[in-house]
Amino acid sequence: MRLISHKPLWLALVLPLVACSTTAPPAQVATPVPMGWQAPLPHQGSLTDMARWWTQLQDPLLVELIDAAQAVSPGIAQAQSRIAQARATQVGSRAALLPSLDAQASASRGFNDQLARVATTSQAGLQASWELDLFGANRAAKTAADERLAGAQALWHEARVSVAAEVAQQTSSIRTCLAQQQVAERDAQSRGETSRLSQLSERAGFTAPATAALARASAAEAQARASQQRMQCDVEVKALVALTGWEEPTLRTRLAQPVAAAPDTLFTVDALPAQVLAQRPDVYNAEREVAAASADVASAQAQRYPRLTLSGSVGAAQVRTGGVTTDLNTWTIGPLALSVPLFDGGRRAAQTDAAQARYDEAASQYRAKVRQAVSEVEQALVRLQSTAERADSAR
């Protein structure tokens, strides 16, 4: 009869569990991507490995400069720190799925009323607890942590590629500047010699004073351009010193060495935009953030439902009084505790709404990131095509 009297109570607790379920928004967001590029593809567009594209330039100095810049880059250091933070969060989320085990020990001495004498009591034990995660709150939190770790790793790759691109662009700019400086200095030297000869001819009466004056002005103008070009090259070199941490004399010595011509085909672009975008770490990170935000919504929804926790303990105690020692061993399984949210002033509902809003934001940012990536690739293709046309015209 006693068991029957408790049956309605258990039914009242179990039936709500059956009706509870979580519905998270989709972890992947459909984004319209063009079927093909509008700009022409270089070399008919075949896919190659872009992990270390700078090694394909056959420029040992550039590889050294990029490695040095990546070693001292604060952006890469921050990306590594974010990976460490994301990995720590992932470990914590995994731990929430496992039982917890704590050790306890105590000792006391005092008067025992039952024994009517002073007693020393010592005890030690293990306390275990495990949340059964009925509705997947902890599993969803782990999924979100996994996705954010993947996104943090993608941002680390993006930081590396960004530093490599910046160093490559700066190095190319310096070499172009130095080549222009040589042209400007030769031009200044040539015009200076022309001015000197014009002055000699003027003194001999073979050249009009106006012609000699024009030659002097031309020489002064060429000298000013050469000086301006040297200043620009010095600024470019100092910027590269700041990027790489190299000593300036060493950098200038290495830059003065001859450079092998870069291959015509450095890398190519796939004909399908979706495959190209899949290589971009920033797009991948935005995609992973959408998946993480979806898991956050599921976790927030699950927090509104009942929670079931199983506890247990095992221990040993010793009581010593009047020269007599008594040993006691204990163990328990339970209680099996069910916690049912009844009223929280709307806190859990607000947390769910906030998680949904963050998901909507992440989805919007992902779509914007895809559009931006398509635009950047299109612009880069246009620049590549223009550069190829100018190179053909210069030959």
Segments predicted by a language model, with ranges:
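A short glycine-centered flexible hinge/capping loop motif at secondary-structure junctions
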Residues: 202-206
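Membrane-embedded beta-strand positions in outer-membrane beta-barrel channels/transporters
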Residues: 66, 123-127, 171, 273, ...
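Small/polar (Gly/Ser/Thr/Ala-rich) solvent-exposed segments
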Residues: 97-119, 129-160, 178, 284, ...
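Amphipathic alpha-helical coiled-coil segments
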Residues: 78-93, 159, 165-195, 200, ...
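Transmembrane beta-barrel architecture of outer-membrane proteins
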Residues: 62-64, 121-123, 169, 214, ...
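Terminal intrinsically disordered/low-complexity segments used for targeting and assembly
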Residues: 2-71, 146, 230-278, 320
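Amphipathic alpha-helical coiled-coil scaffold segments and their short linker/junction regions
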Residues: 66, 70-72, 92, 144, ...
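Short loop-to-helix capping motifs
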Residues: 59, 72-75, 131, 178, ...
